[in-house]
Amino acid sequence: MLAKVNSAALYGIDALRVEVEIDLASGLPQLATVGLPEGAVKESKDRIRAAVKNCGYTFPAKRITINLAPADIKKEGSAYDLPMAIGILAAEELIEKTQLDNYLLIGELSLDGSLRAVRGALPIAMAAKKEKVKGLILPVQNAPEAAVVHDIEVLGVRNLPQVVEFLNGAQSVERVQVNLDDLFKQHSQYNSDFNDVKGQQHVKRALEVAAAGAHNVILVGPPGSGKTMLAKRLPTILPDLTLAEALETTKIHSVMGILNGQAIIATRPFRSPHHTISDAGLVGGGTVPKPGEVSLAHNGVLFLDELPEFKRNVLEVMRQPLEDGNITVARALGSINYPASFMLVAAMNPCPCGFFTDPQKECTCTPLQIQRYRSKVSGPLLDRIDIQIEVPTLRYQELAGKEAGEPSAAIRQRVNGARTIQLQRFHKRTIHSNAQMGAKDIKRYCAVKEDADKLLEAAINKLGLSARAYSRVLKVSRTIADLAGSEEIQSAHIAEAIQYRSLDRGV
């Protein structure tokens, strides 16, 4: 007897339809799985046998062959437990086959027949909609996430008997639906605000400029000056996620299984990996490729604290995602492209002891030690960071001051205004922010007045900026002009942008 059940396989951050074919034949009782199954899929036969028996069904004492088609795509994870079990029962004619073509099934089985959550419910729901199946049957824990996709019937189930009864028409399962507008309102609040930060007005201004133009930032300052606190609040002044951005961000987190019960991610991600992370952990990889931190920070902020402590090869692999907004992971079975459009915020001490620029504590480092410490971060990587800003230690008067800082909402309003100007400027292009401008765009949109040009020339000659750094100054100047509502880049905008090249000036 033969039965076919629809399921799906994850490929990158997308999903592909998989047909689970089950054949029961005479012979010695055994269960063989073919179609490039990974370890967890091969182990599923024991879970399925126990679950079927513990739910009161008879497991067929026959030669069972399960094929996962197409066979050239690697199948991993435990999401095939449910479609395999349903296929076996359908082949034994315990389930009506008429409904099987209408639904796509995923879910991990416990030994008692209950269902556990699986990874990738959102991209699988999108694949089901694309394949024009009627609905998706999956564990109830994954249902809110999958229900974000409209125009498909999402059915959350708790155990194997519930699925069997539903497919036989003996029991109904309530369709899970969510209101996207309510979800956005519920999950779009941040727990921190820029008015939590005392002082550091010039750093806040630099971060406002960075947010307005999507520029990468490096914060240089002694320990305890507030670098991490400022970085964590950067997402609160970035423009709100659009629905398309939220869905793409949620897909990445869904594939990694780290949604933690959320139906959708409605706030900008903030990722802060430890400096001991490997290159595969940062950009993605592994035997079975998975997204790295740069992809988990997609549409948000990637914060690298203690930048010189990261391994040099780890930092160098970030060049591609910083330039292209995506990362390609190549393996023998093919290449997978992950989105990685993020704002990089790095933090570092000015020297090994941390007090080179501190007016109160004396630095104990030699010039050679300082040079070696800073050389751990390569010039090409620093050139890709538009804004370099010093974060000094706060004085007591600033710490003890009771004056409330400007809230994130007020700063975000100005940032939104600048972003609107940029969207109008690039509406016929594939880019959407000043940081993404290429050489032709800079030539077209970053024309400066004569007095501003002379100021820029003097700064370039004195600081010895590279050609890429020169472009960064012009991009930042364009953003400052946008914040000021100015069509032309003026000398004041150039002067402020040059101030954001701290490392070029030796801090």
Language model: regions and residue ranges:
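Short loop/turn elements that form and flank the Walker-type P-loop nucleotide-binding site
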Residues: F59-K62, Q99-L100, K132, H150, ...
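Switch/coupling sub-region of P-loop NTPases
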Residues: S192-R205, A214-N216, K251-L315, Q320, ...
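Walker A/P-loop
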Residues: L219-I258
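Short, well-ordered beta-strand core segments
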Residues: L136, L302, D386-I389
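Short beta-strand elements
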Residues: V18-L24, L282, D386-I389
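Basic, amphipathic alpha-helical bundle interface domains used for macromolecular binding and assembly
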Residues: A40-K45, P60, N67-G77, V288-P289, ...
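Peripheral, non-AAA+ core regions of ATP-driven protein-machinery
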Residues: M1-I218, S225, A330, A469-Y470, ...
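Alpha-helical scaffold elements adjacent to nucleotide-binding pockets in ATP/GTP-utilizing enzyme cores
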Residues: R47, A51, M84, P123-A127, ...
